[in-house]
Amino acid sequence: MSFEILTYTFMHRALISGIAIAILCSVIGLFLVLRRYSLFGDAIAHSSFGGIALGLLAGVYPLWTAYGVSIISALIITKIKDRYNISGDASIAVLLSSGIAAGLVIISFSGGFTIDIFSFLFGSILLVSVNDTVLILALTGAILIVILLLYRQILYSTFNEEQAKVSGIPVEKINYLIIFMAGITVVTSIQLVGVLLISALFVIPNVTAIMYGKGFKQTAIISMSFSVFSVVIGILISYIFDITPAGTIVLLSIGLLGITMGIKSAGLLSKN
């Protein structure tokens, strides 16, 4: 592999943005997986599709409208689940289909699918701008700082919600915070893998890491390592062979999962 591609400015932006998104998705995704909200990222991504379509129709930067729609959608999922005693999976399914339906209707008003729409559907990390990179880094830093500051409360409410309530932890507020941060993370990640494959970044590295049977911190580190590896190698391979970055990244993640499953089946993973 020629190292010349590493000298390109657009590749620097793509790799920096990709690594930041990989770390962010791994951390937020781990909390979602442990809370049995694995499909949450998919639902928010599909709902944000409606926001993207709305932004394109209104002539506004699509990600701004997508952020607004995704946050509102995330809060709606939580409210439906809590108030109407509907299971998390069911409320997620409702939101997922609603977002896609709304997006398709809005797109039909704007004259159909365009190149811009396809870039959001399938990702366009190699085209990320300087402003996008700065925004991604700022949001990643802000969310990680919040998680570090509230680490114990978030972790406690994730593993034992009832006991956390007894201990005086504001579980409901923590839940809304997690949902809010997840919504921000989803839209931020759309530029990397697009709306259609976003859940892969949240779920696959974490499922792979969990199979190693380590503690929470070790699992998070393993997940981030796998995610960063898939993103970096995926971006480089996609450029060299002129193939889609999103699909390449996801296939690499699936490959790591398959290797881990093989190692586990062979009894080579220690249980700690």
Per-region residue spans from a language model:
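Membrane-interfacial amphipathic/re-entrant helices at transmembrane-helix boundaries
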Residues: M1-I23, K271-N272
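C-terminal binding/interaction regions
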Residues: S2-T7, L121-I125, F226-I263
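Loop-to-transmembrane alpha-helix initiation sites
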Residues: A14-S17, P62-S70, D89-A93, I136-L137, ...
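Transmembrane alpha-helical segments in multi-pass inner-membrane proteins
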Residues: L192, I198-G247
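Membrane-helix/interface signature in polytopic inner-membrane proteins
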Residues: I145-I178
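Transmembrane helix-bundle core of multi-pass membrane transporters
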Residues: E4-R13, Y84, I92-R152
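Short loop segments and helix-boundary regions at transmembrane helix junctions
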Residues: L30-F113, A209-I221, S238-F241, K264-A266
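Membrane-interface capping segments at transmembrane-helix boundaries
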Residues: R152-Q153, G262-N272
